[in-house]
Design a protein with these regions (language model features):
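Phosphate/pyrophosphate-binding catalytic cores of soluble transferases and nucleic-acid-acting enzymes
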Residues: 1-316
Length: 316
């Protein structure tokens, strides 16, 4: 369990790859412990992008408040720093009302930045740069981003572990924004402790094939629920919906709208892209400090999560 005494407020987090049941577990824990959910999904912030982002439905919330959802139009930029500030305000408000803040989502950069209290640069960051870097990370994976940093700033890369994607992106952001190497200045280090006393629960399946089957089934259900209509909306506004246009779940159908690929082919590409994304999510969270992993397929997964949370809260 990852804990810190910087703040007495307990914060719970439910993380893991796509299609592992994070939303349902978050609701169960909120019902059990009087909590409210803070979404840690970079795409669920956007209005109108519901099916492709697997956004929680009103029925699925069971009346539990869900925050950081449907806040922006798809043409509005939103950075990691924006999320950290937003989540901090939400955490303070939820805790002040005697409720338990529960961070739920698979955007590892959001979760890690919030829980670890990453400091962001004081320099002016060009509009869209952080969103672009986050999209590149999702598309290319952490190894490619680290390789780019090695080429741009070998000294900074040598001082950063390849799996510390937060600092890798910070260094790349500085280089792209200023044209200067971060190693040329005094690097801003991460705070030594997390700003919240936290328990991080991770969901995964023991057999990778289980996860892949769930992902394939989810894509099929999304198509039945109207994913193609959402993808067409993003395609039609791709010049302004730049973040959404790079998101998994929408861009895979652009060839279909352009008449260069069949729908089934695009759906298969989405399934493969989702599987690849799940692998990158696992890589991220497996290297994140303090995650307590649960077998998502186990009948007692929710019961174990409740027990761990109860023990965590009792230590407060």
């Amino acid at each position: 369990m990852a804990e810190s005494c910087n703040k007495k407020h307990p914060v719970l987090a439910v993380v893991g790859p796509t299609a592992t049941g994070k939303t349902a577990l978050g609701v169960t824990l909120a019902e059990t412990f009087g909590g409210e959910v803070i979404s840690a999904d970079s795409m669920q912030l956007y209005k109108g992008l519901d099916v492709g982002t697997a956004k929680v439905t009103p029925d699925e919330t069971h009346g539990i408040p869900h925050h950081a959802v449907d806040l922006l139009t798809p043409d509005e930029p939103f950075s990691v720093a924006d999320f950290v500030a937003l989540a901090g305000r939400l955490e303070a408000d939820i805790s002040a009302r005697g409720r338990l803040p529960i961070l739920v989502g698979g955007t590892g950069l959001y979760v890690q930045s919030f829980l670890y209290g990453v400091r962001f640069a004081a320099e002016k960051t060009p509009d869209g740069l952080r969103e672009q870097l986050a999209a590149e990370l999702a598309e290319k994976g952490p190894e490619a981003m680290y390789k780019e940093l090695q080429e741009a700033d070998p000294e900074a890369a040598a001082a950063i572990h390849p799996n510390n994607q937060v600092r890798v992106l910070r260094a790349l952001e500085h280089f792209r924004a200023t044209g200067k190497r971060l190693s040329e200045q005094k690097a801003q280090s991460l705070p030594p402790e997390r700003p919240y006393r936290s328990l991080v629960l991770g969901l995964d399946f023991p057999e990778r094939a289980q996860l892949y089957r769930r992902i394939d089934l989810r894509v099929d259900k999304m198509l039945d629920a109207g994913l193609l209509d959402e993808a067409k909306l993003v395609y039609d506004h791709r010049q302004t919906y730049r973040t959404a246009a790079q998101a998994i779940g929408y861009k895979e159908f652009f060839p279909f709208f352009e008449g260069t690929a069949a729908l089934e082919e695009c759906a298969d590409k989405l399934k493969q892209a989702s599987r690849n994304y799940a692998k990158r999510q696992l890589t991220w969270f497996r290297h994140m400090d303090g995650v307590v992993w649960l077998d998502a397929s186990a009948p007692d997964a929710a019961a174990r999560a409740i027990r761990l949370t109860r023990e965590f809260l009792a230590k407060g």
